[in-house]
Regions:
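Short beta-to-alpha linker loops that shape the active-site pocket of alpha/beta-hydrolase fold enzymes
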Residues: 48-50, 93, 161
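Metal-dependent de-N-acetylase/amidase catalytic core
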Residues: 1-17, 34, 38, 65-66, ...
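Short, conserved clusters of charged catalytic residues that mark active-site
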Residues: 26-27, 70, 104
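ATP-dependent adenylation/pyrophosphate-handling site
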Residues: 3, 9-21, 25-66
């Protein structure tokens, strides 16, 4: 299904659940740009940090902590550009979501949902190759099972290029599309440019 400009069905409270800072922009940056002037409130949740997995255990802890802070600052700047303030950072260890009990990650998400009460949630895809992304998806499903959280009306998965398409035979297959203008796309690209450490030369996907 293709949805054009009428996004009222999303409700007035929308939550983006991302494994790491930058997944929100890669997956939903165009939508966030499109919603900027709409009468809705948006909350972005980051389950983990996105930096420590690039370092060996022998590297100094203070260097890793500085990189985590830097990336979180990138996230704040990118979201502020799109008119979104106060994202939540839970800073679970990057690349190690499988070392945490799934129920613990689910509780992080559930507590955020109970606090914000979104009508619509966007999160990662089941087919994503990145294990942190996949676990975030599974934990979101766990946290949104029909129960007391009856204010959640819509649940969508989004694509993160460089991981969701890199899964032979089981790549991301969307069944719902929201159209974006060139202006929306340009704003998404500009927002991602705040992530200075994530932009590299071809053939890097970003």
């Amino acid at each position: 299904k293709l949805e054009a400009d009428n996004l009222n069905f999303l409700g007035t409270k929308i939550m983006i659940i991302a494994a790491h800072p930058d997944d929100d922009i890669l997956g939903c940056g165009g939508l966030l740009a499109k919603l900027k002037n709409k009468p809705c409130e948006i909350k972005v949740i980051f389950i983990g940090e996105g930096s420590s997995c690039r370092y060996n255990d022998k590297d100094k802890k203070d260097i890793i902590e500085k990189e985590i802070i830097k990336r979180n600052n990138y996230a704040n700047s990118a979201l502020k550009y799109l008119g979104i303030n106060k994202p939540s950072f839970h800073n679970l260890k990057c690349g190690c979501f499988d070392t945490y009990p799934l129920i613990n990650i689910g509780k992080i998400i559930e507590n955020e949902i109970v606090s914000f009460k979104p009508q619509t949630i966007f999160t990662h895809s089941e087919t994503d190759l990145n294990n942190d992304h996949k676990i975030t998806y599974q934990s979101t499903l766990q946290a949104t099972r029909p129960a007391a959280l009856n204010y959640v009306k819509n649940l969508f998965s989004y694509e993160v290029i460089s991981s969701s398409e890199w899964n032979f035979g089981n790549s991301f297959k969307p069944n719902y599309f929201i159209s974006l203008s060139k202006k929306d796309l340009d704003k998404k690209i500009r927002a991602f440019e705040y992530y200075l450490s994530e932009i590299k030369n071809y053939p890097y996907a970003r």
